[in-house]
């Protein structure tokens, strides 16, 4: 640990990327890259992270559990359905009880308000592993992936095409924070949340970022350095068959990517539905970096865990 300092964060929790400054985000990314190259740093020896899941997960569960093991700690899986919280115990009581037993909480659930209450009532760090509104850990990994590719955010254009969902929301805040140009193209009626867009635009004024919300996918990806998409059907929306027809012009395919820079890179938070939001030709092609991106979930989250846990040990 002689070469890279543990980032000092001015927050107990990570619920959205609003809580981090540009400097903190860059420090986390640099620390994550260090940890990527030094996987077995036992920086959280003996620490326990509770992992509460109300939604299915592959990447979030495995990356947090593996990350805690690599850092010398332990990840404890807690099914939301099996906890007393699933049978009527309040979020507040759950937060206070867990604070007596473990050192931190990661929660992946539906209601963002529940995560906010959990953080408010707990004395230990709480990390949002995904809600219906935000996915900050994914956005941190996305920023890390972009930074590894081009070593800057200034002058870089990220195009997000598809549903204006939780991933889109966190990317908007992330891009605004680091001063990156981000365009979003969605069908009418599927734009990102208006309040989150307003927050991103306000942050962008301070950082020099550009944020554009469009409905034309070709315009959105024009001269883009990175093209990003997500599934058209988020968890809980399966069966909305009419969305498939509406979203078809927003598929990432060889015709659409012709409008991007020739050197563009393709991003996807996964899981992917090939031949729906993206063709196999693109996601499995040479300009796709989706698996490197998925791998960076592990490293970005490790950096976040160490930073938040150390903040509790050494409050400013």
From Swiss-Prot:
InterPro entries with a match to the protein in the record: Asp/Orn_carbamoyltranf_P-bd, Asp/Orn_carbamoylTrfase, Asp/Orn_carbamoylTrfase_sf, Asp_carbamoyltransf_Asp/Orn-bd, Orn/put_carbamltrans, OTCase_ArgI
Source organism superkingdom = Bacteria
What reaction does this catalyse? carbamoyl phosphate + L-ornithine = L-citrulline + phosphate + H(+)
| Molecular-function GO terms, alphabetical | amino acid binding; ornithine carbamoyltransferase activity
Query: GO cellular component terms?
Result: cytoplasm
State whether keyword Iron-sulfur applies: no
RNA-binding in keyword set: no
Q: Which family does it belong to?
A: Belongs to the aspartate/ornithine carbamoyltransferase superfamily. OTCase family.
The protein's name is: Ornithine carbamoyltransferase
Q: Which source organism?
A: Bacillus cereus (strain ZK / E33L)
